[in-house]
Structure formats: C-alpha cells, structure tokens
From Swiss-Prot:
Protein name (Swiss-Prot/TrEMBL): Large ribosomal subunit protein uL16
InterPro entries for this protein: Ribosomal_uL16, Ribosomal_uL16_bact-type, Ribosomal_uL16_CS, Ribosomal_uL16_dom, Ribosomal_uL16_sf
Region of interest (Disordered), residue spans: 1-24
Protein's gene: rplP
Alphabetized UniProt keyword annotations: Ribonucleoprotein, Ribosomal protein, RNA-binding, rRNA-binding, tRNA-binding
Protein's job: Binds 23S rRNA and is also seen to make contacts with the A and possibly P site tRNAs.
Compositional bias segments (type: Basic residues): 1-19
UniProt-listed HAMAP family: Ribosomal_uL16
Length: 138
C-alpha cells in the first residue's frame, strides 16, 4: 500500500476538490495515459487495485507509471461516538485528484493491449476517466 513514510502533522484539513489540475496533465513517461475528468479523492487501495489490473493484463512486456500518491490523511470518528472530543483517527490516505490529471501511464508494444489494460484500471477508480495518447496531445 502507498502511504507516506512520515508526516509532520498526522491530521490535516480536508483538501479542496474544486478547480482543475495545474500540473501533471500531460503524458510524459509512457505512450498512453489515464486522465481524470472529475474531481475526486482516490484512496491507496483504489490505486493499488488499478495497478494490479494493469499489470495482470499487460503481463511482462509493458511498463506502468503511477503519477499520483496518497499523501493526504482522511480522518473519521467511530460510529456511535458523540460530537466533540477532538478530531478522529486517520481512516485512510487519499490523493486529491482534479480534472485533467494523468493518473497512470503505460507503454506496451501492442497498442490494443495497453488501451485495454488502462480501460480495466479506469473501472477500478471512483471518477470518470479517459485514455490519452502521447502523440495526440501536442
């Protein structure tokens, strides 16, 4: 699972989900990318699930890059606890994703296999995504 090794403050405010991605919206490493179309939080479990889906479909011939990292903690108080008494414990780690952000990149010799692998990864994510090619964006 992807979580930070150490953080200065264990509990943070919730990040804003509005606006568009300022950076990380071009395919740089691979030949194909998975681009978010909606603002959302993506948990470390969802990132891992999508990564496994890509790797299982592409097998050995390809390479995958994960361009997001879950660096923001989300806290939640236990069920049945009254209001007050401080902020709850960290429940999960999330990546704050805004529209336009490239989430995953892949390269594979066969284009159909790479696109199908990214499509399967998109089904594991909580937002609408589209597949972009490196040569189409310039």
């Amino acid at each position: 699972m992807l979580i930070p090794k150490r953080v200065k403050y264990r509990r943070q405010h919730r990040p804003h989900r509005s606006g568009v991605s300022k950076g990380g919206n071009r395919v740089t490493f691979g030949d194909y990318g998975l681009q978010a179309l909606e603002p959302t939080y993506i948990t470390n479990r969802q990132i891992e699930s999508a990564r496994i889906a890509i790797n299982r479909h592409m097998k050995r011939g390809g390479k995958v890059w994960i361009n997001i990292f879950p660096d923001r903690p989300l806290t939640q108080k236990p069920l049945g606890v009254r209001m007050g008494s401080g902020k709850g414990p960290v429940e999960k780690w999330v990546a704050n994703v805004k529209p336009g952000r490239i989430l995953f990149e892949a390269s594979y010799p066969n284009e159909e296999v790479a696109l199908e692998a990214l499509r399967r990864a998109g089904n594991k994510l909580p937002c609408k995504v589209r597949i972009v090619k490196k040569e189409d964006q310039f």
